[in-house]
Amino acid sequence: MKSLFDFDEAFGRNMEEGELNGITSLKIKVRTRIKFEDKTKRQNIQKLITELPVPGESIHIVSNGSFDYFTVIPHIIELAGEKVTDFWFSTWTLSIMNVTAMLDLYDRGVFANINALTGDYMKSRESNVYNLLLTGCQKRGQRISSNKNHSKVTLLEIGTDRFIIEGSANFTANPRIEQFILSNHDGLFQFHRGWMDKILTKYAQ
């Protein structure tokens, strides 16, 4: 049967399978219990997330831009009541305030490590913020890489829990409607950790 679409012409580049930007395209299928939360009228993160997902559960959330996406992280840590033994994140760009907060969490022992992936946009257009993150990670012996990255994923290993945050927001304070999924799932955690580690192993700066 003839295809209804010429993907190369209709949708732009459709390259053959292979490694690009440090990884091959990946997928994972997991079974989780879902909670849906439309929180566009809630005004802060404490009201937005009142309990953490149990293993095998995910919470799907729409927020109204009234809080900084990075503030989800210390709130999760507070609810969990334990320190983060493994911290990974991938984002297009960060604000200087969130870079400072992240390094402070490491210095206070809340984060055992930092594994950071950013977009090359940040490196070229927000060079002062990127350099703060770069030098901060390098001085502390932590890993950072910048490439053609637009993914937004955060991984938090806390005790026996494996929390994953996937969504539309960067680590910035832009007041926008955003969606994200907070999951507690070891398989999904290892899936994202795998491709992040591959990039950082090859291209850490």
Show the residue positions of the predicted features.
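PLD/PLD-like phosphodiesterase catalytic module centered on the HKD motif
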Residues: 1-205
